[in-house]
């Protein structure tokens, strides 16, 4: 509604994140102010799984991007069918990297690199939805995406957001500092439906935890 800012949605596993993200993608697809809607996953198997799920909800909704070349063609395409694109963060990162081997080979041949071909999209309004945004959204690929698409709005879906208390800590210039949190990347929490909510609503099964502390290492190895 506000046409600005980023945000993340904290929905627990099994609560229907894929269906929610599909509905968000279809609404964005029909928004004339949005040039593209990218749904970005962090693994190849999730790429296939998401496409299959989206196409179950609406047949022919998204096509397979077999490689980076296909991804780039769909990104620059003005075909309405190519407005929603499901891809991996690795493929998108590769398309925006001018220093990789493939880009250097294209330069030698006098061909445009993937990044150069995507230049017309640089200042376009693009919505980028990151699945499982607690995982690989803090690396170089994510930085490259944000730098190349400065006007993009970023939305993240996660069942386990990274907060300061569960972030990984490291030494930074001799002082202790934590890695980036989900809020640092995606700013505002748009909605939360946690495991507690899901259990209370009986949408997921309750679970019981037992703690066992062996008396010594020998007992531990025997138990394992």
Q: Where are the language model's segments positioned?
A:
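SF2 helicase catalytic motif II
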Residues: 104-110, 114-155
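Conserved RecA-like helicase motor-core motifs
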Residues: 8, 36-38, 51, 57-72
């Amino acid at each position: 509604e506000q046409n600005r800012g980023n945000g993340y949605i904290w929905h627990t596993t099994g609560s229907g994140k894929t269906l929610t993200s599909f509905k968000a993608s279809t609404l964005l697809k029909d928004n004339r102010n949005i040039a593209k809607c990218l749904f970005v996953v962090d693994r190849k198997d999730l790429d296939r799984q998401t496409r299959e799920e989206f196409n179950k909800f609406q047949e022919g909704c998204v096509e397979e991007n077999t490689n980076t070349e296909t991804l780039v063609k769909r990104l620059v395409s003005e075909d309405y069918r190519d407005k929603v694109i499901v891809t991996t963060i690795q493929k998108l990162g590769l398309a925006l990297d001018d220093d990789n081997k493939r880009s250097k080979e294209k330069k030698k041949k006098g061909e445009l690199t993937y990044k150069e071909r995507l230049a017309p999209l640089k200042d376009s309004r693009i919505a980028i939805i990151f699945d499982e945004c607690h995982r690989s959204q803090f690396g170089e690929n994510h930085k490259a995406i944000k730098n190349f698409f400065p006007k993009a709005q970023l939305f993240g879906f996660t069942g386990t957001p990274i907060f300061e208390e569960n972030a990984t800590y490291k030494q930074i210039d001799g002082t202790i500092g934590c890695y980036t949190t989900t809020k640092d990347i995606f700013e505002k929490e748009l909605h939360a439906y946690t495991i507690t909510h899901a259990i209370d609503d009986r949408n997921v099964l309750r679970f019981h935890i037992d703690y066992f502390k062996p008396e010594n290492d020998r007992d531990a190895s025997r138990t394992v």
